[in-house]
């Protein structure tokens, strides 16, 4: 092998990988209607998971769970959600969890432990840490701010 063979092989492999990436990305563009159907199905499954109490039984929802339900790989579902919404599938799930938590925190009859269990957290401290990281305040602070303004 001469001194140019290695660089030629590398260049050809790079071209092949670029073609692979091109075709992979193109499928998200050319299948827009089907992608929207998958996204709607993902949202429906996520709503059903949170509303049915499955989170308290099975834990925090995962991308893998929903990908299996939709018959896609977790990576493909993640890429599809990212291309359609700009958010990763995990961020999408977390956003839904935060919205459910915010609605639950407005109800004075639910304490933080109950809300944490409802969302699938095994420990209220994990929920409080998650909530503060996502929202910027603790669940108690959020509740106090929103009860005061209601």
Where are these regions (language model features)?
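Short hydrophobic/aromatic patch on the recognition helix
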Residues: 77, 126-127, 131
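A short, Lys/Arg-enriched amphipathic alpha-helix from helix-turn-helix/homeodomain DNA-binding modules
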Residues: 10, 32-70, 91-110
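Amphipathic alpha-helical segments enriched in hydrophobic/aromatic residues interleaved with Lys/Arg
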Residues: 1-15, 19-20
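Residues within helix-turn-helix
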Residues: 64, 75, 111-114, 124-125
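Residues within the alpha-helical elements of helix-turn-helix
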Residues: 69, 118-119, 134
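Terminal helix-turn-helix DNA-binding modules in bacterial transcription factors
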Residues: 83-122, 144-150
């Amino acid at each position: 092998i001469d001194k140019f063979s290695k660089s030629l092989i590398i260049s050809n492999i790079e071209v092949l990988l670029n073609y692979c990436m091109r075709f992979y990305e193109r499928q998200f563009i050319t299948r827009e209607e089907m992608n929207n159907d998958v996204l709607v199905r993902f949202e429906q499954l996520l709503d059903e998971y949170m509303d049915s109490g499955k989170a308290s039984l099975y834990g925090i929802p995962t991308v893998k769970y929903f990908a299996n339900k939709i018959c896609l790989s977790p990576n493909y579902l993640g890429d599809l959600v990212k291309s359609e919404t700009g958010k990763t599938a995990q961020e999408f799930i977390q956003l839904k969890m935060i919205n459910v938590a915010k609605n639950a925190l407005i109800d004075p009859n639910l304490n933080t432990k109950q809300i944490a269990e409802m969302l699938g957290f095994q420990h209220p401290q994990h929920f409080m840490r998650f909530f503060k990281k996502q929202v910027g305040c603790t669940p108690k602070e959020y509740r106090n701010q929103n009860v005061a303004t209601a």
